[in-house]
């Protein structure tokens, strides 16, 4: 029953969403946004790191999923987004969490069935999928959508891994099988 932390990075607002996966069932654990008021970028990055670290400490996730960088029209915005992503990833790595990245289009496709869905469509579907009584804030809904996408990826990868190795039973074995399936092209090396 892995706990998944999804992050929607931003240099002003970083959304987060935490779910627990129990087979095909998803349980909502929490969500919100790290709001950053600092004007200088180094202070904003420090705030993101502290916020993500606090969330990790509070919820003790097993996995960390984050949106990949997309090509923005404004190079300065893309650089700031990349720095915010990197800061959140460092917080996860410092807590020994495996990091998984997903393209925004794949996240939208997974949650709504439409790769070009807008934020409100994602928010509506996340609310329905997790059976929430109220809609989460938009950035939190995006983060939850990233976590949901990772949960679906786990489910698919475990089916494939178990077909190849029926003896997989423990949570650690499942995570290692998932990572080996995802990174089998040699981009990353796994210990153990």
Curated annotation (Swiss-Prot):
CC annotations in GO: cytoplasm; Holliday junction resolvase complex
Compartments it resides in: Cytoplasm
Predominant subcellular localization, coarse grouping: cytoplasm
Pfam family, one: RuvC
Swiss-Prot/TrEMBL catalytic activity: Endonucleolytic cleavage at a junction such as a reciprocal single-stranded crossover between two homologous DNA duplexes (Holliday junction)
Annotated Gene3D superfamilies: Ribonuclease H-like superfamily/Ribonuclease H
Entry annotation: catalytic residues: 8, 67, 139
Cofactor binding remark: Binds 2 Mg(2+) ion per subunit.
EC class of the enzyme, as a word: hydrolase
Annotated positions binding Mg(2+) 2: 67
SUPFAM superfamilies in alphabetical order: Ribonuclease H-like
One MF term in the entry's GO annotations: magnesium ion binding
Keyword Transferase listed: no
Protein's GO biological process: DNA recombination; DNA repair
NCBIfam families on file: ruvC
Record-stated family: Belongs to the RuvC family.
Protein name, per record: Crossover junction endodeoxyribonuclease RuvC
């Amino acid at each position: 029953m892995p706990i998944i932390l999804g992050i929607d990075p931003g240099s002003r607002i970083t959304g987060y969403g935490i779910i627990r996966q129990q087979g095909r069932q998803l349980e909502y654990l929490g969500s919100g946004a790290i709001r950053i008021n600092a004007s200088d970028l180094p202070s904003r990055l420090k705030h993101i790191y502290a916020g993500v670290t606090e969330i990790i400490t509070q919820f003790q996730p097993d996995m960390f999923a984050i949106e990949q960088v997309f090509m923005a029209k404004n190079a300065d915005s893309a650089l700031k987004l990349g720095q915010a992503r990197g800061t959140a990833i460092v917080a996860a790595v410092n807590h020994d969490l495996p990091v998984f990245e997903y393209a925004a289009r794949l996240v939208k496709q997974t949650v709504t069935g439409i790769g070009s869905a807008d934020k409100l469509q994602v928010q509506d579907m996340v609310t329905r999928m997790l059976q929430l009584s109220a809609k989460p804030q938009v950035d939190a809904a995006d983060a939850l959508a990233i976590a949901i996408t990772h949960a679906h990826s786990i489910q698919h990868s475990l089916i494939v891994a178990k077909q190849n190795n029926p003896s997989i039973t423990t949570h650690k074995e499942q995570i290692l099988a998932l990572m080996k399936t995802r990174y089998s092209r040699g981009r990353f090396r796994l210990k153990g």
